[in-house]
Amino acid sequence: AQSWATQRNAEVMLYEVGAWTGQFLDGTSALELTLDQMADTGIVQVVCAGNLANSNKVIQGLLPDVTDPIGPVTTSFKVSAGNLPKSTWLSYLIPNGNHISFIELTKPDGSTISLSNSSSSIDLGNGDSVWISRDTSTRNTNLLNLVFSNSNGLTPGTWEVALAGPNGQGQVLFRGYEADDISSWAGGSHWLPPSPSSLASIGDNGSVTWPATADSA
């Protein structure tokens, strides 16, 4: 994109794309860095910030560690019976090198499964599965991805994910992002209020989407 724009003497470049799951959102992706490089050459970069306001797609708060008496923070999303996504993506971002060490999933039927030591796809029964991945950016942002899938539509009801950090990490900032394959900026599966509310809440902080998270955007 950079050489294409330079060869054509571009003065302004407009991007109409916005993603909020599966990204570090800290300016370190290849596209974000390319935007910075083109901005440095004088090409104005215009990037949409997204439209996630009041969409229940973003959670922000404090992640406790496993020894915190307040317990883990529980995030949850709802799948409605009349609007079943085949895939729902959850991304949790923890800056400054902090990370999540405890992950426990509670399915709509109330059964629980530990995902703390998982890094691949797990069969959850009833056609549901979850794929777990972790990564770290060059700015030391840790990313946990959970991808829930069912070719016939995810089991309806409330899905809960309880999270905590390692012993001694204390309470640290985290954000959670949710998206699915049947909705866009709003609708579909969405976050429910996290618990306890003293640790985290649904809000609009951190709702700028990729690649508007580039340093120069």
PLM feature spans:
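Loop-rich non-cytosolic ectodomains and luminal regions
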Residues: A1-A217
